[in-house]
From Swiss-Prot:
This is tRNA wybutosine-synthesizing protein 4. Pathway: tRNA modification; wybutosine-tRNA(Phe) biosynthesis. GO terms for biological process: tRNA methylation; tRNA modification; wybutosine biosynthetic process. It comes from Homo sapiens. The gene is LCMT2. Probable S-adenosyl-L-methionine-dependent methyltransferase that acts as a component of the wybutosine biosynthesis pathway. Wybutosine is a hyper modified guanosine with a tricyclic base found at the 3'-position adjacent to the anticodon of eukaryotic phenylalanine tRNA. May methylate the carboxyl group of leucine residues to form alpha-leucine ester residues.
Length: 686
């Protein structure tokens, strides 16, 4: 890489600091953390989305956890030396000011290193802000050619390139850093921006230079799955590519990396584990109630793709003080794959409107016509709640073709709902239940979609009108992320609506029965233990009842239970399905029953370092097995959450429609085309 290319890339990395600083300011402004200094250090303001807030919150709490563990250990009465904090790539972070205000720097000092331009700008900002100068005390500013940009009794800011370690060591020594003193080295999203050889040299240099130290690292991992690929693509487009992820893709590889570089002990956890194990339940509830939130999939994916690591040298700094082992977050890794389901793109769909949306619903209108409605996606060149309906149809040549239609007439129009359910009542009628317009606005009313074909019976000329169903004052369903399943009791057909969430309740445990013939809500006795509340679960019709699998529970942790609402003489009975081996907890998946087997497709899980494929459960024996999805012939990342799926039992295929989400700060991703899964190996293995 030439000098000019290095300079351009360094500039791009510095730009990530500016964006991060604004996110931290927004985080504090919304009350996630107490940090009055973020607004003083960062000019301007930006209101970030709730998902960004949560991501930066867990990052801030993880770093705070490590810093406090270090200071509490070094601050013990027997400690003789002053503690040192060396923040690498510190940017405009306010750590020094927060520690100074909290009285935690009585026997400690802070050094910060960043690119010269960033360091000078921060030093200037501090110097012109009286509130900050009052905390630093008397200070000096370095000469323009000097690495030292700011110096007070317990705070130094240096402008240095971390790739030039000899100069870094000399400048730190001149600024008073004592390598023999207990030292916390902090690198938040820093090492991954360095070329692999530079990052390796920095880790080894720190191990050799500081005999009594703790090295805390926060950065990205898991580049292999669809979210990881999209994350890598985002940073490449910013001209700040992430390095080293292929060689060190997970926490185990990162542990080995530091141990082999000379660190004596190392512990690391991903951010899902940190959030659930190292934050008190009361604090989690506080954060979860700060502002409306409904992007659980991307929140858990973001946390699965970042880790916090603490590597130590010396007897007084043990990594177990930072991340003690916990049984509160057991790892539940799936069994070794029993087979593979090949995936392929529906080829003929590429020349027609694509189904680029998520949070929608899909249903068969007829054996050769699939309707998808609602969700968030692309429409007329912008991202929005989609109002057009998508049809996937095929002729006698068995090639699927897509088309889009809008509602006709001047009556009821599609209201833009998502996370609703759709049930086919006939070839010309579809029932729409629940959904939301936003996390604080449920979609009101039950809708019926009525379809009319043209005189030549051309599916592409299908017309749709929308009517309100049920009573105008019916407020039974103000929920979303629920399920609707066709069940039967005493020769009567019902729709069983279960779970979900609402504006008032973050997770629901209740259910309702809708009589199909009269479109009236009825009460039917249900016996057995009431299941744990959940949303984003799956539900399938089976033997007149409903199979409920997985979901997200009240603690925002995925569930692994499979339940059967079994018909009995007087109504229904809840039963638990015993599964061996137990399945990995998951949610936001889809499910189907094929030849006495329950298929759980895709979804989100947080208790395993792998990513979900298809779990197959034999409903007779209770035995479960795992199948990988081979995406060799899918030329783009395939995200299997917020999607829908349609089973083609005769062809032994599964159609995967839509899916994706708002992927943290990396942008919104939609699966661009419909994908087919070949399930024939499942029948071959019978």
């Amino acid at each position: 890489m030439g000098p000019r290319s290095r300079e351009r890339r360094a500039g791009a990395v510095q730009n990530t600091n500016d964006s991060s600083a604004l996110s931290k300011r927004s985080l504090a402004a919304r009350g996630y953390v107490q940090d009055p200094f973020a607004a003083l250090l960062v000019p301007g303001a930006a209101r970030r989305a709730p998902l960004i807030h949560r991501g930066y919150y867990v990052r801030a709490r993880a770093v705070r956890h490590c810093v406090r563990a270090f200071l509490e250990q070094i601050g013990a009465p027997q400690a003789a030396l002053r503690a040192q904090i060396l923040s690498l790539g510190a940017g405009f972070d306010s750590l020094y000011f927060r520690l100074k205000t909290a009285g935690r720097l009585a026997r400690a000092a802070v050094w910060e290193v960043d690119f010269p331009d960033v360091a000078r700008r921060k030093a200037e900002r501090i110097g012109e802000t009286p509130e900050l100068c009052a905390l630093t005390g008397p200070f000096e500013r370095g000469e323009p050619a000097s690495a030292l940009c700011f110096e007070s009794a317990d705070y130094c800011i240096l402008g240095l390139d971390l790739r030039q370690l000899q100069r870094v060591e000399e400048a730190l020594g001149a600024a008073g850093l004592d390598a023999a003193s207990p030292t916390l080295l902090l690198a938040e999203a820093v090492l991954t921006y360095l070329e692999p050889e530079s990052a390796a040299a920095l880790i080894a240099w720190a191990a050799q230079r500081f005999p009594n130290a703790l090295f805390v690292v926060y950065e990205q991992m898991r580049p292999q799955d669809a979210f990881g690929q999209f994350m890598l693509q985002h940073f490449r487009q910013l001209n700040s590519p992430l390095h080293g992820l292929e060689r060190f893709p997970d926490v185990e590889a990162q542990r080995r990396r530091f141990l082999q570089a000379g660190w004596t002990a190392c512990g690391a956890v991903d951010m899902n584990e940190f959030y659930h194990c190292f934050l008190p339940a009361e604090e989690r509830r506080r954060v979860e109630n700060i502002e409306p939130f409904d992007e659980f999939e991307e929140w858990h994916l973001k946390c699965a793709h970042y880790f916090i690591l603490a590597a130590s040298r010396g007897d007084t700094l043990s990594h177990t003080l930072v991340f003690p082992s916990s049984e509160a977050f057991p790892r539940v890794n799936p069994a070794s794959p029993s087979g593979v389901f090949p995936a392929s793109v529906v080829s003929s769909e590429g020349q027609v409107p694509n189904l680029k949306r998520y949070g929608h619903a899909s249903v068969f209108l007829s054996p050769d016509v699939i309707l998808s409605a609602g969700g968030f996606g692309e429409q007329e060149g912008r991202h929005c709640r989609v109002s057009q309906f998508h049809l996937l149809s095929r002729d006698c040549d068995s090639e699927w073709k897509g088309s889009q239609i809008g509602s006709c007439g001047t009556g009821v129009q599609w209201d833009g709902r998502l996370y609703h359910t759709m049930t086919r009542l006939s070839e010309s009628r579809v029932l729409v239940l629940g959904g939301r317009l936003s996390p604080v606005s449920p979609a009101l009313g039950v809708l019926q979609l009525h379809f009319f074909k043209s005189e030549d019976n051309n599916t592409e000329d299908l017309k749709v009108t929308i009517t309100k169903a049920g009573r105008k004052d019916d407020s039974t369903l103000c929920c979303w992320r629920h399920s609707t399943t066709e069940v039967s009791c005493q020769n009567q057909e019902y729709l069983f609506v279960y779970g979900g969430r609402s504006v008032v309740e973050p997770v629901l445990s209740d259910w309702h029965f809708l009589h199909v013939g009269t479109m009236a809500w009825v009460r039917i006795p249900v016996e057995g233990e009431v299941p744990e509340a959940r949303h984003s679960h799956s539900a399938c019709t089976w033997q007149g009842g409903a199979l409920i699998a997985g979901g997200l529970g009240a603690s925002e942790e995925p569930l692994n239970s499979v339940l059967f609402l079994r018909p009995i003489s007087c109504g229904f009975l809840w039963e638990s399905v015993d599964i061996q081996p137990p399945i990995t907890p998951r949610y936001s998946h889809t499910a189907h029953v094929l030849n006495g087997k329950l298929l759980l497709v895709g979804g989100i899980w947080i208790h395993s370092s792998s990513f979900p494929g298809v779990t197959v459960i034999n409903l007779t024996t209770g035995l479960s097995s795992e199948y990988q999805i081979d995406t060799t012939y899918v030329p783009w990342p395939l995200m299997l959450h917020n999607h829908t799926s349609i089973l083609l039992p005769e062809e032994q295929q599964l159609l995967l429609l839509g899916g994706g989400g708002n992927c943290f700060s990396f942008g919104t991703y939609f699966n661009p085309h419909t994908v087919t899964l070949d399930l024939s190996s499942l029948s071959a293995g019978q």
